[in-house]
């Protein structure tokens, strides 16, 4: 399973990061009040990690992992506000330019 850790003291995650998925250990880290989109984003990483296994997940490129998350966000966009969707689109487009 996936362990969810709350960064209560703000000592685990950098200030500009609300949530993160540790794919080596299979842990999600959340700040005290993460946005809905960030919770789901990391949850989608965890979902893929569980589906294909740690080893296969670690062999994926960052872009491949983020493309999966983006696809899941778009399938579930009714859960998110417009600003969150727009940010997700901008984020994946930046990564596509950087990694393709």
Predicted regions and their residues:
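Catalytic toxin/effector domains delivered as secreted proteins or via bacterial secretion systems
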Residues: 1-100
């Amino acid at each position: 399973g996936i362990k969810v850790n709350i960064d209560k003291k703000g000592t685990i995650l950098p200030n500009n990061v609300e949530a993160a998925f540790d794919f080596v250990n299979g842990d999600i880290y959340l700040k005290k009040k993460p946005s809905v989109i960030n919770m789901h984003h990391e949850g989608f990483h965890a979902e893929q990690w569980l589906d294909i296994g740690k080893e296969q997940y670690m062999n994926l490129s960052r872009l491949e992992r983020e493309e999966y998350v983006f696809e899941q966000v778009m399938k579930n966009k009714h859960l998110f506000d417009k600003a969150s969707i727009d940010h997700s689109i901008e984020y994946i487009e930046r990564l596509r330019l950087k990694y393709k």
